Amino acid sequence: MMTSSPPPNDLTTLQTLSEQELVKLDWQSLSCFSGELLELHAEGKLGNENFAKLPRKPILCIDQIELLDEHRIEATFQFPANQSEWPYDPAESLEMLFQDQLDQLVGFWGARKIKGIGRALSSGRCTLYQSLDFQPSKTLRFVLEKRKWMTSKEGGGTAVFNGKILDDADNLLLDTRNVIVGILNPTDIHDLRQRFGGKSGVAKPDVNEKISGLRIPVFDNDLGSVRSGDGKTISREATQSISPDLWPLRYHFRGDPVVPGNFGTHGMLALLKTSASEDFGLRNPVFKSMLKKSFSGMIFEDQKQIRFSLLNVVQNDEGDVVAKEARLFLENADGSKMIEDPIYTFKGLTVTEG
């Protein structure tokens, strides 16, 4: 029998409960979540073993959820005071890691309504206003407001939110419109695994492992640029090998390993930054914005490769470098396509001089 829930927004009470008490709570009825509750959810210990789970740290960068109700989500994360305690390389660009937290929060919201597995489907315009790189003790606030929730005849659902990342002085750091996450039937995910290479499984994280200096995977084979016949646009491709040893798969998600979609976005940005430097002369290209991204497939763990493809890359009047379109394809290890259509597409991916 479930115990009665603590009062809404009573993080103080939650933080006094033992693990044995926390696992007895009906997490789907709570309106706030301590860090320990989020970690238990990631491990499937809240009655969600066969359903949606949050990623484990270090992919999960949410310390607690202060508010989660029918219309709004508010959560926070604080960087550690010492760089040595931060698991990522301090020089790493992290805007896509933190945008991924918005997707995770929307999926978590939807999984309270339907017992399924959340997957990001798309998002609209995303704009970076200030750096999201490591800054000691800095606090980030994730604020999301619901636009709509739709259920399907098959039993799934789709949640749409607008999301922002703020600092503790309410300065806007990043905003994303129309974050869309679907809640899928677990059997559908199983079928996708069979079709797209998710049979190998991955090693469990070592609980005693000291994680440091992590880099988000980008690409391991830059195939270079091709200039159009009129010389006005550039296209560029690169590939990356996928195997069960790729580190993000150990943490995202337990029992359902998949490369985070926004890590693929990070790789596409890295290729655009390379083009901006080599093809257009930018000294320090950084992410500025994108108009839209869409996910129609997932990168599972079996040996394969992914292909990044930038199309119609130009420099605009402001000096920004823009990929009017970008696509990510799933390929077999020999370079033949697993499926003809791209599994990720991007519109208006833009970098600027940092």
What positions do the PLM features span?
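Non-catalytic linker/capping segments at the edges of enzyme domains
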Residues: 2-92, 112, 133, 147-158, ...
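Hydrophobic/aromatic beta-strand elements that line small-molecule binding cavities or substrate pockets
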Residues: 63, 163, 290-293, 325-327
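Active-site helix/loop of acyl-thioester processing domains in fatty-acid/polyketide metabolism
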Residues: 65, 90-118, 258-283
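4′-phosphopantetheine-dependent carrier domains
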Residues: 113, 119-132, 137-150, 164-166, ...
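OB-fold/S1-family single-stranded nucleic acid-binding modules
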Residues: 120-123, 157-158, 162, 321
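Hydrophobic, ordered structural segments
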Residues: 142, 159-179
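Solvent-exposed strand-loop boundary residues in beta-sheet-rich modules
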Residues: 169-171, 332-336
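A structural microfeature
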Residues: 173-177, 339-340, 344
